[in-house]
């Protein structure tokens, strides 16, 4: 069947109106191609009288009224499967790494339904990250969804890079990284880091373990809105082959923001704080597809920017509902020089349950949180009256809490070049042993600076000898 042909009748920034014959009107999400150009338009609204409103997935420079447009009659499709490994692609699956075309033998549409309820597979298995604070208070589930929440400059991307370093490199499965509206420099650094560590095999790309999809912050809103779906489609294809996939998204907030821009351009009435009225639905459509089935699993780690450090902002608040573990990064903790700046009282995990992690882990985590909470309550009294006015048991709780706080810090492998101290991977058993000793009072004689930026508790004892 010949492709339906239309003409551009209006072009306002990234929004392009196209007129077709009334009986050939494209469906919502159909991909339209420009004559003599690589630009793709995606249908968002049917305005009636054969006119559709579309979003340009690329720059709309040079478009003018009267240009010819063809309807492909299908959703945007992107290459999936082994051909994507070791490659950097854009929202349409076109390569941007200057290593030749991507094999298009296997393709899949970026819009599809989430798996049915009876296909889903819940998981109780823990995923060890080697980061003490995460493994202790907000453990990750294999096949679960994790959010890294934080304002500007508290370390979301560095934490994500460390998780990739600790999990993806040791992980026998495959990883997909979707860079949604983030800095191009970070995408470039990530690629070179993956190449240096062998996760991207430059000699034989098919042996690589990661596929990368980028729609960075200099791209039009259409690209940033759809690039998460492109990455997810590639991850789903690996999952449906029966593999265990790690899916990293940096940053899910930019996905929301791109939706806000597109919504405003389409003329929709904004809702709370200027967000799109379809925020919950758009987020749900993406998040419900990121799931594990009986065939394979997707473990997803998403960075979530928190505007003005306000966790009640509609965007992070909508994301919270979909996650199994939430890692909240705090500016107050970062200002103390404690990195990773994870707030152990705000961060949560569904896995922190004695039936899942075991009684020992659960009791240690709760004792650590209880000690830190007591310190938080006493801080006002200390600020007004000083430490000397506290009861002896409260003084002891404060001393232990300060040691715990410092022991929650850890040198990262990915930050080695900045800090000069080698990164540490701490096993879950060592993490529990260390915090158990501090809570039990076995380290009361050590100075608190011995606990700062060390790996295991044995290193703290060694450091104490030098202090």
Swiss-Prot record:
Belongs to the ATPase alpha/beta chains family. GO terms for molecular function: ATP binding; ATP hydrolysis activity; proton-transporting ATP synthase activity, rotational mechanism. Gene3D superfamilies: 2.40.10.170, Bovine Mitochondrial F1-atpase, Atp Synthase Beta Chain, Chain D, domain 3 (1.10.1140.10), P-loop containing nucleotide triphosphate hydrolases (3.40.50.300). It is a peripheral membrane protein. This is ATP synthase subunit beta. SUPFAM superfamilies: C-terminal domain of alpha and beta subunits of F1 ATP synthase, N-terminal domain of alpha and beta subunits of F1 ATP synthase, P-loop containing nucleoside triphosphate hydrolases. Its main location: membrane. Produces ATP from ADP in the presence of a proton gradient across the membrane. The catalytic sites are hosted primarily by the beta subunits. It is found in: Cell inner membrane. The keyword Secreted does not apply.
């Amino acid at each position: 069947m010949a492709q339906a042909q239309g003409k551009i009748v209006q072009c306002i920034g990234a929004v392009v109106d196209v007129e077709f014959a009334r009986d050939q009107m494209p469906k919502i999400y159909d991909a339209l191609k420009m004559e003599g150009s690589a630009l793709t338009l995606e249908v968002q609204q049917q305005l009636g009288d054969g006119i559709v409103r579309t979003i340009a997935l690329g720059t709309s420079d040079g478009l003018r009224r009267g240009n010819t447009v063809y309807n492909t009659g299908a959703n945007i499709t992107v290459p999936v499967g082994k051909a994507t490994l070791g490659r950097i692609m854009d929202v349409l699956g076109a390569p941007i790494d200057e290593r030749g075309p991507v094999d298009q033998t296997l393709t899949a549409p970026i819009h599809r339904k989430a798996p049915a309820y009876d296909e889903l597979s819940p998981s109780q298995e823990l995923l060890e990250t080697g980061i003490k604070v995460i493994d202790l208070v907000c453990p990750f589930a294999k096949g679960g969804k994790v959010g890294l929440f934080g304002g500007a400059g508290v370390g979301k991307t560095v934490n994500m890079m460390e998780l990739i370093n600790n999990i993806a490199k040791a992980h026998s499965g495959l990883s997909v990284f979707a860079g949604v509206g983030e800095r191009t420099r970070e995408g470039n650094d990530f690629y070179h880091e993956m190449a240096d560590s062998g996760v991207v095999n430059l000699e034989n790309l098919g042996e690589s373990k990661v596929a990368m999809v980028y729609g960075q912050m200099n791209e039009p809103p259409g690209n940033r809105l759809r690039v998460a779906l492109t990455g997810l489609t590639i991850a789903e294809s690996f999952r449906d082959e029966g593999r265990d996939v790690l899916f990293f998204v940096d940053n899910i907030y930019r996905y929301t923001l791109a939706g806000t821009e597109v919504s405003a351009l389409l003329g929709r009435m904004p809702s709370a704080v200027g967000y799109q009225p379809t925020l919950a639905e758009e987020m749900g459509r993406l998040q419900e597809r990121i799931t594990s089935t009986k065939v394979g699993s997707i473990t997803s780690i998403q960075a979530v920017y928190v505007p003005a450090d306000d966790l009640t902002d509609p965007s992070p608040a909508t994301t919270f509902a979909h996650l199994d573990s939430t890692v909240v990064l705090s500016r107050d903790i970062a200002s103390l020089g404690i990195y990773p700046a994870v707030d152990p009282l705000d961060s949560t995990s569904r896995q922190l349950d004695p039936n899942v992690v075991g009684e020992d882990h659960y009791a240690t985590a709760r004792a650590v949180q209880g000690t830190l909470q007591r310190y938080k309550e006493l801080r006002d009294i200390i600020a007004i009256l000083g430490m000397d006015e506290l009861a002896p048991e409260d003084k002891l709780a404060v001393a232990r809490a300060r040691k715990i706080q410092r022991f929650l810090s850890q040198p990262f492998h990915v930050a080695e070049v900045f800090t000069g101290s080698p990164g540490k991977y701490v096993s879950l058993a060592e993490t529990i042993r260390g915090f158990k000793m501090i809570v039990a009072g076995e380290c009361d004689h050590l100075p608190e600076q011995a606990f700062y930026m060390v790996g295991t508790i044995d290193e703290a004892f060694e450091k104490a000898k030098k202090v």
